[in-house]
Amino acid sequence: DELIQAMASAPKVCHYIDIPLQHCNDRILKEMNRCSTDASIKDTIGRLRKAMPDIHIRTTMIAGLPGETKEDFAQLEAFVEEMKFERLGVFPYSKEEGTLAATMKGQVRQQTKEKRRDAIMALQCSISLEHNQAKVGQVMEVLVEGQDEDGSYIGRTRYDAPDVDNGVLFTSSRQLEPGDFVEVEIIDAFDYDLVGREVEA
């Protein structure tokens, strides 16, 4: 709680946090030597969102971990649907030589792992679109990173890590340089990108 309150009150701290949860099933988390549980994860996320209503939470999940049953995966899907993370990536479990997980029973077929990965990503795609559509009409501060081939500017908000999160495509009537901060009105939204125009001073 002390750390959450520090984040909420510090003006120079972005309300963005990356928590690599990887799964929500209690048994799987225990086998991964994680101290967290489904209930504790939900409690932490709830406290973060209560303290910072605008917080954007990024996480990563692993689909097809050894021993993951159909029921376990269904729980993971329901968890992602309930939590509605602003940013989420998912990867199929990769068997790495020399790791404990590589020797565990219940290895999931590669095709099944990829199918489960695709299902979570399809779900997250709709969640991301929902979050982005809610931003249409808002004015957001954007960090300019460059220009597209058609002359549109490319940037990101304080809620987007470079290379992995959303981008903002926007127009401006003036010349901008990478590193500039501008106010952009969001006029359209896609799954993983926002479209806008600079607010004239």
Over which residues does each language-model region extend?
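Conserved non-cysteine loop/helix-boundary elements of the Radical SAM core domain that shape
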Residues: D1-E86, K95-T112
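Short N-terminal helix-initiation segments at or just after the protein's N-terminus
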Residues: F85, V90, S128-N132
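Terminal RNA-binding accessory module
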Residues: T103-A201
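Generic beta-strand/beta-sheet core signal
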Residues: P20-Q22, R58-I62, F91-Y93, E145-Q147, ...
